[in-house]
């Protein structure tokens, strides 16, 4: 495909998605659901009693990252064109025996069974069909795509014929941990090398070999950022790696869409730019998420709550840019796979996952689950409680919180609640390709900045740079760019026209605009920010009516520094403490590790607030009210006019 045809297709998809967003925003939440790798029937009964009737079934054919089978049932995909549908049916029928009212999210395992990997190797595709660890190599392999597409079609047709409208959605799962992550780190076999040549031709680039692997592990500028003047092939290869995965996923999504009725949804794990760090930010394959988010064949995306900010006092958060998916009219499913003190750590007599640190006690479990439920409910997101290998939701106290969370989600989750954020975090996948993702600073760019904003004491939203051309930026008084390394002339014009406006504060961190898309030049940093590259601390300069804040070091971007900038910009700080706040419409959630009496400030006047888990009503005076929090605690307030 020519570059122009590719760009026209992407723009058309974006316009179609924008039309969906303009017509009514993101998809309504699909479900409050239950999921486990293993058939935890007693837990399913407890969730049924709590009003949860949607169950995710993962009829896996493959092993997990620990080498253990995902599934307790026999594999479904047994050979080319040979399927054990009796095993598939039993997994759904066993749930129906426990809960005759159950409906399903059907997760389709598109990873390679060991027999397929071995057979394709014998056909000359050695190392090019292990989709779990070498995803981009498998996606570039026509033989793998053909066999996998045939399996996908067989499963979907069978499910539609046997279970019909009990299926709410199909989840297309592949790659490392079935989250479409690529662990090949740039390795290319014959098929991927041929696909690279085709990609270069389609993008108007001269033919060149796959970059040497040792070049992928270093970068020209401070061993952190790549210079497009000398490393353009590496930047292109990073985009190609993501493109070959996205092209494959788009093909599977279109194939599935053609086999199901319109009301059935399609979802997948993708777009983890706020989570992936060491060796995965660039080479994990998720940076090309914008093409998937613009697809009319995909209805929603999924991620676990972030793994890096789960303890008490942390803000959790989606791994994907929430503002981008909303702008594209997509739904979201928040995976609550957080560990409680009762979770099962032993997969068998030899393998355990005890290194996964759980919440410490029932008080932390209650506060943590309320935090996760509030995050999903306030953002109009679906969710599932992921029981993994059992025992996570074991106590009656835990299930009482689940039942309460389900009722509140049903009441508020499907309402079109207007966001309350006055702070925007902007990620830029095009700039992220510049990063040497083996550098220790990589974890500070997006994951680290998001975790610090989690302690702002005010809500914030996350957008992608390309969203800035069409999102309404008027509510945002502070805009944060922690990784805007590439500022082309087109990007510079967009910043000037839409972002750097009178009355707004814009924070740039570490080398913003150092590249214009062709070369690196540190002098460009001062041109953009008014401050020299290496000046320590957070510098503030007035620039034509707007305020440019600049931090040369990620270490200077502390929660305290962010709160100071936000307050100076006029952002409503709901709490003086460094705590997470979620807010939209009439809902405000505040989570604390250490309780006590706190004064809460609201963005709008109201008569009183009602804490929805306890029913406690507190009067509001001058947009403020006192509230006594437990240790730890999450409170979900409804503002009463």
Locations of regions flagged by a protein language model:
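The substrate-binding groove and active-site-proximal loops of carbohydrate-active enzymes
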Residues: 29-38, 68-86, 130-150, 230-247, ...
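Bacterial N-terminal signal peptides that target proteins for export
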Residues: 1-11
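Bacterial N-terminal signal peptides
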Residues: 10-19
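Carbohydrate-binding surfaces of carbohydrate-active enzymes
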Residues: 262-263, 295, 299-641
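An acidic-aromatic substrate-binding cleft motif
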Residues: 26-53, 423
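Aromatic-lined substrate-binding rim segments of carbohydrate-active enzymes
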Residues: 40-131, 156-158, 251-260
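Polysaccharide-binding and catalytic clefts of secreted carbohydrate-active enzymes
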Residues: 109, 117-307, 315-316, 321-322
């Amino acid at each position: 495909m020519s570059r122009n045809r590719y760009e026209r297709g992407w723009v058309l998809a974006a316009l179609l998605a924008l039309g969906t967003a303009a017509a009514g925003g993101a998809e309504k939440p699909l479900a409050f659901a239950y999921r486990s790798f293993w058939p935890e029937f007693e837990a399913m009964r407890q969730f049924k009693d709590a009003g949860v009737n949607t169950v995710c079934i993962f009829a896996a054919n493959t092993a997990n990252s620990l080498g253990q089978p995902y599934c307790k049932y026999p594999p479904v995909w047994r050979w080319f064109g040979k399927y054990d549908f009796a095993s598939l049916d039993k997994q759904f029928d066993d749930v129906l025996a426990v809960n005759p009212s159950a409906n399903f999210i059907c997760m389709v395992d598109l990873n390679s069974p060991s027999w397929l990997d071995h057979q394709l190797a014998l056909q000359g595709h050695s190392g090019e069909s292990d989709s779990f660890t070498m995803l981009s190599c498998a996606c570039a392999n026509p033989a793998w795509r053909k066999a996998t597409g045939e399996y996908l079609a067989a499963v979907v047709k069978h499910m539609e014929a046997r279970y019909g409208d009990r299926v709410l959605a199909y989840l297309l799962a592949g790659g490392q941990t079935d989250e479409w992550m690529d662990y090949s780190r740039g390795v290319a076999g014959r098929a991927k090398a041929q696909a690279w040549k085709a990609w270069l031709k389609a993008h108007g680039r001269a033919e060149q070999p796959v970059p040497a692997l040792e070049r992928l592990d270093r970068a020209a500028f401070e061993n952190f950022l790549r210079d497009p003047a000398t490393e353009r092939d590496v930047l292109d290869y990073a985009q190609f790696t993501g493109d070959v995965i996205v092209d494959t996923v788009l093909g599977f999504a279109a194939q599935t869409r053609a086999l199901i009725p319109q009301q059935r949804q399609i979802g997948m794990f993708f777009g983890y730019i706020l989570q992936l760090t060491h060796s995965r930010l660039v080479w994990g394959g998720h940076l090309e998420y914008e093409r998937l988010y613009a697809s009319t064949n995909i209805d929603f995306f999924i991620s676990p709550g972030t793994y890096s900010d789960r303890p008490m006092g942390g803000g959790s958060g989606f791994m994907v840019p929430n503002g981008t998916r909303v702008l594209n009219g997509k739904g979201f499913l928040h995976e609550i796979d957080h560990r409680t003190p009762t979770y099962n750590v032993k997969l068998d007599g030899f393998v355990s996952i005890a290194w996964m640190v759980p919440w410490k006690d029932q008080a932390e479990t209650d506060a943590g689950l309320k935090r996760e439920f509030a995050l999903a409910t306030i953002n109009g997101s679906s969710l599932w409680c992921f029981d993994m290998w059992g025992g996570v939701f074991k106590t009656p106290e835990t299930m009482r919180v689940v039942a309460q969370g389900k009722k509140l989600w049903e009441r508020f989750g499907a309402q079109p609640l207007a966001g309350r954020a006055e702070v925007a975090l902007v990620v830029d996948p095009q700039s992220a390709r510049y990063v040497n993702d083996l550098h220790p600073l990589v974890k500070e760019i997006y994951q680290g900045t998001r975790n610090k904003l989690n302690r702002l004491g005010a809500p914030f939203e996350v957008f992608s740079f390309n969203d800035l051309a069409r999102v309404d930026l008027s509510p945002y008084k502070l805009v944060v760019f922690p990784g805007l390394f590439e500022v082309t002339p087109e990007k510079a014009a967009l910043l000037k026209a839409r972002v750097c406006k009178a009355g707004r504060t814009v924070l740039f961190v570490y080398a913003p605009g150092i590249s214009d898309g062709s070369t690196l030049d540190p002098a460009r940093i001062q041109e953009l920010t008014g401050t020299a590259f290496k000046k320590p601390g957070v510098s503030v300069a007035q620039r034509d009516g707007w305020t440019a804040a600049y931090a040369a070091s990620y270490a200077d971007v502390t929660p305290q520094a962010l709160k100071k900038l936000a307050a100076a910009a006029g952002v409503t700080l709901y709490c003086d403490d460094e705590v997470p706040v979620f807010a939209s419409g009439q809902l405000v959630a505040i989570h604390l590790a250490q309780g006590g009496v706190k004064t809460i400030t609201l963005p709008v006047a109201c008569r009183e607030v009602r804490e929805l888990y306890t029913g406690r009503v507190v009067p509001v005076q001058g947009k403020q009210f006192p509230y006594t929090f437990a240790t730890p605690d999450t409170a979900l307030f409804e503002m009463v006019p």
